[in-house]
Design a protein with these regions (language model features):
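Membrane-proximal N-terminal amphipathic helix
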Residues: 38-64
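Sec-dependent signal peptide cleavage junction
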Residues: 27-43, 431, 435-439
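N-terminal single-pass transmembrane signal-anchor helix
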Residues: 4-32
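Long, domain-scale functional regions
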Residues: 64-66, 71-92, 103-107, 111, ...
């Protein structure tokens, strides 16, 4: 009787397995390459679409005489799961998009892609760890430097800074969003994203400097509020006008976790002398950025006058101050703009002939800029040195110029801190929806 349905022999089974293995060896890489190329093409298409829409947006804004910057979020709602850092610059009317992928696009990036040409390359993110080391690693990558909005300034210190309309410099700090100004030596410098409130930099009795305050940070009323109350938790009197006019203190405070990360830093509080023509040219309102930066760290104090009702305080002047919380410098604001002119002239764009501030350059593509009018100003740290007065401080106006006001005026306060050298970045991409987490 014959066997029906004879099974496979061991040799035949082994042969089948070998054949299947060969098929897999040949087919799987091709399938993988197909999937990879499809993802790459899709990612490149996204960059081209953003560039095309950015150019349309630019035309619309020009018709409306709107000189504001254009960011990726103005163009399209990107899926945070699959898209990370995104930035837009313009070469004339040509939009250039830099885009980093994550999720299904992990490891892909486009640098300066246009609507007609966007080539995706592969990029590897640095390992999380010490914050300064992580940011320096981002800067050292040609791709990540661009997509994260990093640069080195043109000062002798060559500080790494974040620039542009919306770079990836958000951090979760004090259970709220702050932003990284840059890396200064071994410290990361932060500034609060939202204003804390409007306060005088300093005020005084009517018999002292005509009631307009004293432009010496080590004794300033705002210094007392930021370090004794906002940081220290002990109530102080807050001021909002001339002649020691009081106001309600802001309710914000720093929690214990945030305070543990803040360095007791020696801040430079040098004054900028408005009559120094290497810094300020009064006839053209030109302000030399590097010279201004050096003066912020210089030896001039806010009192170069010797007499007068605006110059009769007896306060000892200093050019450094050790403490926890202060304010940004005017040059921090200038270098936050990606406009190249701001590296040499903080007040570029001023129309001297018509005394017009409508087209100020450094407010453009500047993540740190606040406001749009002359009356929406933010206090800076440095005193303003001028003959005849000892009560004037530098600030940045909403119209986009550095300026000076009496210290007693109530302007917007954006606290700034330096982090301890060992603070780590443990996760996040630096976007507002996925800020860096510090530890």
């Amino acid at each position: 009787m014959k066997n029906k349905g004879r099974g496979f022999t061991l040799v035949e089974l082994l042969a089948v397995i070998v054949i299947l293995a060969i098929i897999l060896v040949i087919a799987v890489p091709k399938i993988t390459d197909t999937i990879k190329n499809s993802k790459k093409a899709s990612f490149e298409s996204s960059a081209k679409t953003i560039a095309a829409q950015a150019e349309k947006k630019k035309m619309e804004k020009e018709i409306l005489e709107d000189t504001g910057s254009i960011s990726c979020s103005d163009i399209v709602k990107l899926n945070d799961t699959d898209y990370g850092n995104c930035s837009i610059t313009f070469d004339g009317n040509t939009a250039k998009v830099s885009l980093v992928g994550k999720g299904k696009f992990e490891g892909l990036s486009v640098i300066n892609g246009t609507k007609d040409n966007a080539t995706a390359g592969e990029v590897k993110m640095p390992e999380y760890g010490k914050g300064t080391t992580y940011i320096k690693a981002l800067y050292d990558s040609d791709i990540l430097r661009v997509t994260n909005g990093l640069k080195k300034d043109n000062t002798s210190d060559a500080n790494i800074r974040y620039e542009g309309a919306n770079p990836n410099n958000y951090v979760s700090f004090n259970d709220e969003l702050w932003r990284i100004i840059g890396v200064f030596g071994d410290n990361i410098k932060l500034v609060r994203t939202e204003e804390l409130g409007k306060l005088s930099w300093d005020s005084s009795d009517s018999s002292v400097n005509d009631g307009y305050g004293v432009n010496e940070w080590s004794q300033a009323d705002l210094k007392e509020y930021l370090n004794t109350m906002y940081y220290g938790g002990t109530s102080v009197t807050c001021y909002g006008g001339r002649n020691n006019s009081t106001t309600t203190c802001p309710t914000g405070s720093l929690n214990s976790t945030a305070k543990s990360m803040i360095n007791n830093y020696t801040w430079n509080t040098g004054a900028i002398n408005s009559s120094d023509t290497t810094i300020v040219i009064q006839e053209t309102f030109t302000v030399n950025t590097v010279a201004f930066y050096n003066a912020e760290r210089g030896s001039v104090t806010g009192k170069i006058c010797t007499s007068g009702s605006d110059c009769n305080d007896t306060v000892t002047r200093t050019t450094t101050w050790p403490g926890y919380v202060a304010l940004p410098y005017a040059t921090d604001w200038a270098y936050a703009s990606s406009e190249t002119a701001c590296a040499t002239n903080i007040n570029d764009g001023y129309d001297v002939a018509n005394n017009n501030f409508d087209n100020m350059t450094c407010k453009k593509n500047n993540w740190m800029h606040h406001g749009s009018t002359r009356y929406e100003a933010m206090w800076m740290l440095s005193p303003y040195a001028r003959s005849g007065v000892a009560n004037v401080v530098w600030n940045v106006l909403g119209v986009g110029s550095v300026n000076s006001f009496r210290a007693s005026l109530a302007l917007s306060v954006f606290p700034s801190v330096y982090l301890n050298t060992e603070v780590k970045i443990t996760s996040g991409s630096g976007s507002s929806s996925d800020p860096y987490i510090l530890k």
